[in-house]
């Protein structure tokens, strides 16, 4: 993941190493130019002497080299983090991103008599809202000694090494950390049971297991892209679909080495070249049994908030400290399709989703809830409904219909529970919804 000086020249649009000095020289005032001559292939010592002549010129040179030139290279250089292609871009202002998804509405039966007095009744849309906050505010610190600057102007080759070392010292660290943070998004999502899980045999254990893995992946990709959409493949159980070209497979290097790329491309109904752009190979997942994930391109919610370089001189120590600040929003979209292919021991139920997960109900009103059970064993599992925090008269039926007491004032928690354990050793998987209570004279309907 090392940046070469050719990378530096390409990102800056220059052909010679001394063009960097001239770019800095052109950005400075007359005083700087009076000391530092126009750089050529033959006057490196003269250029170095001019830069080293006094502290003001040195400071101007280092500040421009690190704060401006270095930052341009870091932004433009080839992408080394294999997950970087999923980043959404830059949002420099604010620290919160609001994601809104409006689910489909339910069919109503025509009734001529009801139409007369319900024509102006409001039907609030089933809107899901998620907030993604800035959660990475780090910086990278490096030092440039006076002696390093002096040595840099022995030759243009030394100068190239000097510039490359400055950029690599911070770029490699920032790239590796960003990669690890983005991988962690996958493992955290899996550990919380938010992926839809497809159980498989360990693909590398046999040819048959590898073939079966490809079949299941092909079937899953097909289901994700059906035009009517589905609630089965995202952790909010909203009805949505993906397009085949938007599906990305993330796998580790060991599994990728066993797979036939041409066979995989056919599974996704894509040509080999296009498909390779939708396969991301990583060094491995932290979660045991997690073999691969198939995600929509909109699943990652990663934004750059700030990339900034700052330089300061320490006159007592005869060195410059430079700091590269990286602020980011690192998150994922729970309304986007995301599937995990898992071997080994997999729970029979990985998640229970209650919809709507947020509701506002009038005193004396009702709200229908639905439970979506993410099962990996292909079986139907009994859902037990309960409501907590309510007063006498507030109750929920066995099919998820909540009735709120006319005197209810407390916030309620509706729970849908599936027991995948035994009578002696229960193992509960619980989904929840939060219900706020509105006074009986409040207007509007229930909201999701």
Curated annotation (Swiss-Prot):
Recorded family membership: Belongs to the phi29likevirus major capsid protein family.
Subcellular location: Virion
InterPro entries in alphabetical order: Big_2
Role noted for this protein: Assembles to form a prolate capsid shell of about 54 nm in length and 45 nm in width, with a T=3, Q=5 symmetry.
Superkingdom of the organism of origin: Viruses
Residues covered by the BIG2 domain: 348-425
Protein name, UniProt field: Major capsid protein
Signal peptide per UniProt: none
Keyword field: Capsid protein, Coiled coil, Late protein, T=3 icosahedral capsid protein, Virion
Assembly mode: Homohexamer. Homopentamer. The prolate capsid is composed of pentamers and hexamers of the capsid protein.
Coiled-coil region(s): 104-127
Cellular-component GO terms for this entry: T=3 icosahedral viral capsid
Keyword Cytoplasm: no
Gene for this chain: 8
